[in-house]
Amino acid sequence: MELHLALRASPLPAADPGRRPPPPRGNFATNCTAAINSTHISQEKFRSLDSWVEHNMLTFLKPVEKCWQPQDFLPDPSHLSAEELGDAVREIHERAAEIPDEVWVCMVGNMVTEEALPTYQSLISSVLGGTVAGSTPWDRWIRGWSAEENRHGDLLNKYLYLTGRLDMRQVEKTIQYLIGSGMDVGVGNSILCGFIYTCFQEKATFISHGNTARLAKHHGDTTLAKICGLVAADEKRHAVAYTNLMKKLFEVAPNESMLAFAHIMRAHVTMPASRMFDGRDPRLFTHFSAVTQKIGVYTVRDYGEMLDFFLKEWEISAVVDDLSPEGRQAQEYVCGLPEVMGKMAERADDRRKKLVNVGEPRYIPFSWIFNKQVCV
């Protein structure tokens, strides 16, 4: 599902991923609570979208019988002899042997994030105020979306286990720690902030899984490449659904949506997997993020391009009606962000080059790969 949305310009941020970020700064969002309160949409406006969700969002969910399932890509012990099963696993081992350690770190980090789905479902349900068995279009979307997402962690977990390249007990501990730690992403109970946040999550996850698919293919594991590609395709479909929803919300509640967009961009919102922990490394998420930046799985430049995409898709600069003075200030702020992100990406590239050219490279051990060290 979601990933680290924005990476800092430095390849190894100094901030402890377990700490809450500083409060947002600026004239119109100095108080986080006040900023979130300004983004609330009325129940009347929100419920007016029930029919729209029914006909324009639920259609992005696939019938279960037409969905791929994890078992489609795994050896099936019920249909293989012991010898055939052993051969199938050996083939997976042989393909996996060619994949570098840093790619496995990214694969595991992505999979662990997917496995924390219960937290994400709880977050969206709490923001929407839905019920477990509710029949509204919103309730059905949440359950259907979660059901599709659930296959991602299942498949990645099982396949990575079969590669023999990972310390699965450490991976499993990381998953349990992450789900148990909960998540406060800084959106309060704002529906609009929650949906904008999720738009970025789904888009970032699509990018990340797509890039791991490319790397797996490059190193010769076409099956793993296909698996990551299928997950990326699901994430892209979900991202389109959430992006279309926010475009509609900008039409229905332009001022509240603009303030929500600015809040998400300014508040240094905690990333979904920022509490990632394996029982050993308190800066695990920071180190994982540094690896994704280094090998191009997810970078500052990706984040900047993603931001630019949403600005254009939601036609932010063209919103003129029903904006308060604060809304116009928020609009000006978010429209100026691509230039800022471009400079951040350039600084990140420059710092990376300096680290390569000056001094010894830095290596970090990851328990997921039996404490082998990876250059960050």
From Swiss-Prot:
InterPro entries hit by this protein? Fatty_acid_desaturase-2, Ferritin-like_SF, RNR-like
State one Pfam family annotation.
FA_desaturase_2
Q: In which tissues has expression of this protein been reported?
A: Preferentially expressed in the flower labellum.
Q: Where is the transit peptide?
A: 1-33
The record's listing under CDD domains reads: Acyl_ACP_Desat
Name the positions where Fe cation 1 binds: 114, 149, 152, 235
Tell me which EC number(s) this protein carries. 1.14.19.11, 1.14.19.2
EC class (word): oxidoreductase
Q: GO CC terms for this protein?
A: chloroplast stroma
- Where does the record say this protein resides? Plastid, Chloroplast stroma
Q: How is the cofactor bound?
A: Binds 2 Fe(2+) ions per subunit.
Q: What are the cysteine partners in each disulfide bond?
A: none
Entry's Gene Ontology molecular function annotations: metal ion binding; stearoyl-[ACP] desaturase activity
> What family is reported?
Belongs to the fatty acid desaturase type 2 family.
Q: What is this protein called?
A: Palmitoyl-[acyl-carrier-protein] 4-desaturase 2, chloroplastic
Which species does the entry assign this protein to? Ophrys sphegodes (Early spider orchid)
Underlying gene: SAD2
